[in-house]
Amino acid sequence: MISVAVNGYGTIGKRVADAILKQPDMRLVGVAKTSPNYEAFIAHRKGIKIYVPQQSIKKFEEAGIPVAGTIEDLVKASDIVVDTTPNGVGAQYKPIYQQFQRNAIFQGGEKAEVADISFSALCNYDEALGKKYIRVVSCNTTALLRTICTINKVTKVEKVRATIVRRAADQKEVKKGPINSLVPDPATVPSHHAKDVNSVIKNLDIVTMAVIAPTTLMHMHFINITLKDKVEKKDVLSVLENTPRIVLISSKYDAEATAELVEVARDLKRERNDIPEVMVFDDSVYVKDNEVMLMYAVHQESIVVPENVDAIRASTRLMSAEDSIRITNESLGILKGYLI
């Protein structure tokens, strides 16, 4: 049983903490919070131990939230830390993890240099075995890598061109925008996503562009893949249908908008309406000779959660990629095939 700490209990952290509680080989030591907001109250209500910075203890106690100790205490009590702090903050915490000689999993908001390896479970699990510091790539990069590495099983992927329509903010982020604008992210080519993909697949020819849209629900990707050999559409659809963490969306559902997909998640009683699988619209899959085009939706709040669970096992050498991915998927109810 591996003892896991989660530093940060926001959008990703609370989902990772809940995922750890569902694993048969992991124990959640507790979570770290810096402010006694509603998420801290809910964590306490769930019975999760809360650790805080030394200077914040009084603030939490005055709010009526018991404190189990400092963040340093949390790190010391764990075997490995999943750092889900805001972008750039994880690098500031790394010296603490080093001080107590603890392995750590970082998120895609950190620079790749913070870790020994950037990670995508379907692409490079074996390369991450035993690595002390692993960086799970961002939500968009996770979706790109899942898709690319899956299609690479049909025949070698030689070139990728992708356009990413990014959601402007998560649903709880009331101070972010835009409200009524499309914002190039950035207005130069390539966007950072290409470099991030190359942190996992070193020599792939990939160019990405991105734009921020006034929505909070999901991202959308439009990608063009050039393969080494000619392929048939049925072979591409088959590999997508039979790969875990990818689901196909049929036009028969009459649910192709991201808002409708969220409603599907509600009706399926998905926790927090999460869909951690890449959602590929099957009618969008276009194949001509060695060229493949497709579009898919990405639920940014949950797609990296199973990757974090697998990264814990890879870092601590708990088990093989196949076993870890299977156990993670089973415990979290993650599908393959068609969503409905």
Curated annotation (Swiss-Prot):
Asked whether the UniProt record includes Cell inner membrane among its keywords, one would answer no
* Self-association and partners: Homotetramer.
State the protein's name. Answer: Glyceraldehyde-3-phosphate dehydrogenase
Query: Where is it chiefly localized?
Result: cytoplasm
Taxonomic lineage: Archaea, Thermoproteota, Thermoprotei, Sulfolobales, Sulfolobaceae
Top-level taxon in the UniProt lineage: Archaea
Q: Read off the SMART domains from this record.
A: Gp_dh_N
What is the enzyme's main class? Answer: oxidoreductase
* Chain sites annotated for binding NAD(+): T11, I12, G109, R167, Q300
State which pathway it belongs to. Answer: Carbohydrate degradation; glycolysis; pyruvate from D-glyceraldehyde 3-phosphate: step 1/5
What species is given as this protein's source? Saccharolobus islandicus (strain L.S.2.15 / Lassen #1) (Sulfolobus islandicus)
Entries under InterPro entries matching the protein: DapB_N, GlycerAld/Erythrose_P_DH, GlycerAld_3-P_DH_AS, GlycerAld_3-P_DH_cat, GlycerAld_3-P_DH_NAD(P)-bd, Glyceraldehyde-3-P_DH_2_arc, NAD(P)-bd_dom_sf
State where D-glyceraldehyde 3-phosphate binds.
Answer: S138, C139, N140, H193, A194
Q: Which residues form the signal peptide?
A: none
What UniProt keywords apply to this chain's record, in alphabetical order?
Cytoplasm, Glycolysis, NAD, NADP, Oxidoreductase
